[in-house]
Amino acid sequence: LYQLFLKLEFSKLIDKMGLSAGPAGGVEEQLQGVGACESEQVTDRARMEELLALWRQRDHVAVLATPTLDAVCVEWGGEGAGKAALFFADKLEGYNDFLRGVFSPEIKKVVHDAKTLMERLLAEGLSPEGVVFDTALAAYLLAPTDGSYELEKLSVTYFNFEVPKARDYLAPDAFGPLADPAIPLAALMSHTALIELLYQTLAPRLEELGLRGAKTAAYAIDPDYGIAV
């Protein structure tokens, strides 16, 4: 993962996630030993509950879910030590309980394009709560004429580097049994880390404009945006 980020000039993400060069090897080998960036794939319910309890104590976590909600990445961590946890519907017993837990009001979340996420959660009968910041909306408020606020564009706009393409983890078979998980995992984790990095960058700029946060400002732009939050 370090070599992939280095190749893409992810200097800020390398620092953010606490990556190091580690032993030589391909992306696949480094992702199998994800410890360099303290990331993990959660397959045990006890570990799931432990992480949910931890996140309830934090002021926020960054969350990115695939459109089907079958895969979720959560990023958090202290100074210079990013951490990531990956959850997959076909690998975690009680996955729906995880979704209810992570999208509960007790866990404060930073997300990208909260409105679309809320629609998907509501369609699955889940109550989307606890969103405290939307990086897509924040980017719109700061540059309303840009036209596109996709993560791939924002990484170039604000940090002058390119992240892996979202299609790497959005493909229907990206995490299938016959797929090589290295590339989609790297893309999903880097996009989630980028959400956190954007939050750290955009929130102070919104404060300078006198806005308390992207979520609060949403009500003035779209009355339906914050419904059920």
Locations of regions flagged by a protein language model:
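A general boundary/transition motif marking the beginning of the first structured unit of a protein
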Residues: Y2-F5, E40, A143, I183, ...
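Long, highly charged low-complexity segments
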Residues: L1-C73, G77-S104, K108
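Extended, non-catalytic structural segments that build the interaction scaffolds
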Residues: R212-A214
